[in-house]
Amino acid sequence: MRGTPLMPRRALGPAGLVAAVVVLIWVISGVGAGDIAKFVGYEIAFVLLPGASLLWALRGREGWLVTVALGWPLGQTLEILVFSATAATGSRGLFPVYPIVVVLACALRIWKRHGHDPSGSSEGQMSAGAMWVAAAALSLGLVYVCLAFLPTVPLPSLARPIQYYVDFPNFIGLIAEVRNHWPPTSPGLSGVPLHYQWFVFYQMAAINQVTGVSIPVIAFRLDFLPTILMIGCQLFVVGRFIGRSAWVGALAIVVAFLLGPLDLTTDAAGAPPFFDLFSFHLWASWTFPFGLTFFLALLYLIAERVQATTWRTSADIRTWVVIGLLMIGASGSKATILPVLLVGTGLYAVVVFVTKRTVPANALVVLGLGIVIFGATFAIVYGGGVPGTVIQPIASYQYTAPVKVASKISSGLLRKAVLPFAYIVGLAGMLLPFAGMLYLLRGPHRGQLSRYTLCLCMFGGGLLIANLIHQVGSSELYFQDTGYTAGFIVAAAGLRLAWMDVRSIGASATKAGVLAFVGWVVVILAVSAVTSPALAQGGLVLRYVAITFIYLAFVTVVVRYSRTAGLPSPGVLMVGLIPLVAAAALTTPIQLSPVIGRFLTGQPMTVTQPDPQKVRGLTPGLLVALQWLQDHTSADTVFAVSNHWIDAAGTDGRNQNYSAFSERQIFVESYNPDDYGITVGIPTLAEVNFLYRVRLNDAVFDHADTGALTILTRQYGVRFLFIDRVHGGANPAVFQLGSIVFSNNAATIVAVG
């Protein structure tokens, strides 16, 4: 394809660095070369090539970075829609043909347009320095994510017991459910529909179907890295487009992956003092980063659209098709994406109307298209409801350290006076990574704020939604973190301007700024070194107060000294930004220091060795039993389990290891109704059915009730009883209810159907 903007030679080095880091992580984490080759081949053939081909067919030839940033999520949408269609029609065998059909059809369209001017954007020249900074920041960000994620997800082992983060077995079970059944239902509540953000699990199931790579290897090792990589690439592209500088894109990667709200406690497993951590959600929620790949692509296209003067030419319509497809992908990937886009675009339209007295037509089209697609997917994918959602403003701030401490003040009058300030401090702590935004308020730079209006509206939209509602498990924070992604670009723009201003003052100012940054790093590390994870919240807050006073003194002294000494004044915003960025940059290193320490000293990075008397995990014996079910039963098999708890006290009923590692459906597995989208206390047929199943299951395993067993086998198709002998066992009479087909020291399987 003549005229195609290929990757410039100067970009090969930065791209090679990131690729080398990804491959090295895969190899170190135990992924075989064959699995890596199959996975990479799949991603290129089934995602990148179809998406890039359709993008070029609709919009003309784009630059290589834009092609990847937009073509990848577009390819994911195509992949998911075709996979769903072939599964729904019982023709899964046709799925491998889809890339050939799409690429050939699009190639024909592109060939027919040969010689026409491309409608896509030109990337022009990019600073080599910006590309290297972006590559280095993204590489370090990948390492951070892996150090947080990989120790929690050892591959299933026949050598040692494992305890997974509570959501991960559920995710594995959902992938297996998609792979084996259509339409997919809840693997832990057999046959019951589960309205959920399924698309990332569709994708992993599709990879398993085509490549044969095991589901745990795909989910725990392979699939998350390209997603994080794509977010970094998209931040660079969107930041460069909106900020009109590659440095804005590079610094957006720095803000997103390397900055966070300061945590002094070196306790990655504990609750952070400012509660919300974007970096945590990148690995703990598989749907969140997957959804962000659609959000950032849409942000780019919407930013492009609102700058356009037309909305209904043939080129416009082709772009609307791309936006519509991405909105479909976004809505099924993460429920927070379209609401934030819609609210943010609505705020943008209001701002433009108020400031310019004009109605932005393209913004209205975005709103109309988004509302239609959101309404359709809300009904189809999510069943028209969001269980556990209530109107409760600023609910998540109550979990920040300042609010916790203020809430414990014994004097009611003093508590009421202090609490509003505690909430403000809690919000400020959450937003520390966005300190760079403040620099745009400096007089000479205020004029640039209008360039970032859309990003600021998306950022504000996420905050607005998150602070109006409350969801189970504080899931409203995903709205906030989705908005954060647009805010990263604005913060990066402020940091770029600050650095340019420092350099404009002179070499001595640049040197002083670097030394001040290093000095603050040393101060904060020193405070962290003497701060125990067991420190009470009050003591922790006092340390933050002490750092704040040192900060205020530092800013005051530097600004006054500059004025009295007749030096060029750096200004309060420039001086004040240095400690804030230093503090934000230390968040992840401090949190990961225990893991890094184990790695450097040669100790095992994975410390999840559960004691069955305290924590219930996946033991080698249980894994063997679950694999027996996977190998000796059909994919449609339903079985019942004796244990539902992840703790020996029987207070947390979210054990979902059985469906995950047998890849079979279970009569009722988790005793936590939230896992099935059921809110106990609100009378519904779903709640009645769930509680009825719990009673039947307990009757079988606790009392060997033959009547209950008859209902299980005849009405619900249960064919096996799985007795977990490590975690509680069952009534001895249960072993007489059928024929024992498998038994070891960890589990017994009784055939009853």
Label every PLM stretch briefly.
Residues M1-M126, A534-T548:
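Membrane-embedded, hydrophobic transmembrane alpha-helices
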Residues T319-A335:
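Membrane-interface alpha helices of multi-pass inner-membrane proteins
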